[in-house]
Regions:
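Conserved AMP-binding/adenylate-forming
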Residues: 1-32
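Short hydrophobic alpha-helices that are characteristic scaffold elements of the AMP-binding
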Residues: 12-21, 43, 159, 168-172
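Conserved pre-ATP/AMP-binding loop-to-beta segment of ANL
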Residues: 90-111, 118, 144-150
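Conserved AMP-binding A3 loop
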Residues: 107-133
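Conserved AMP-binding/adenylation subdomain of ANL enzymes
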Residues: 130-153, 157-172
């Protein structure tokens, strides 16, 4: 499931929902070139595309097959899509969690920024993400003593570091 969005709460909801359902989340940068989008879409072949806005949808529309790929959007877009707010209103989340997930199963594919050729996809397992979170929580233990800690993050959520930090904010 490809996620193309700027940082916003629906991004986090989408990412966690895909991974909890047993899908593979593929967050990508909003700043890629047209060639990068084309390459990534051809490389990972997502069955589902989550996009935040019509502006971002226009960046990828020439490289997707709307007959084969379902689209979920955060806002109305020019193509037929499901709106995330409608899905959230109608979903029983407990039923959607894949109870058979294992630590060694793929959870997401993080693509590099592509500064040296085509972006490279790195597969992260559920266990790899959990290990990163466990290590970060250990480092951030002093923050757990603060009531309602505040985090300031600025990297795109599709960045490998920020992708981990999003989970730490929930844990801490």
């Amino acid at each position: 499931c490809l996620i193309l969005s700027e940082n916003r709460p629906y991004w986090l909801i989408s990412d966690i929902a895909v991974m909890n359902a047993g899908g593979i989340s593929v967050p990508i940068f909003t700043t890629y070139s047209s060639n990068d989008y084309k390459y990534i879409l051809n490389d990972c072949k997502p069955a589902l595309i989550i996009v935040s806005s019509n502006e971002l949808f226009k960046k990828i529309k020439d490289y997707i097959n709307t007959q084969e790929q379902k689209i979920i959007s955060f806002e109305e877009i020019e193509e037929k899509s499901l709106l995330i707010k409608d899905i959230l209103d109608e979903t029983n989340y407990e039923e959607k969690i894949n109870q058979s997930l294992k630590r060694n199963m793929p959870a997401c594919i993080i693509y590099t920024s592509g500064t040296a050729g085509n972006p490279k996809g790195v597969v992260l397992s559920h266990g790899g993400i959990l290990s990163n979170c466990e290590g970060a929580v250990e480092l951030l233990k002093p923050l757990t003593k603060i009531k309602d800690p505040i985090f300031l993050t600025w990297l795109p959520l599709s960045h490998s570091y920020e992708h981990t930090v999003q989970f730490i904010q929930i844990i801490v």
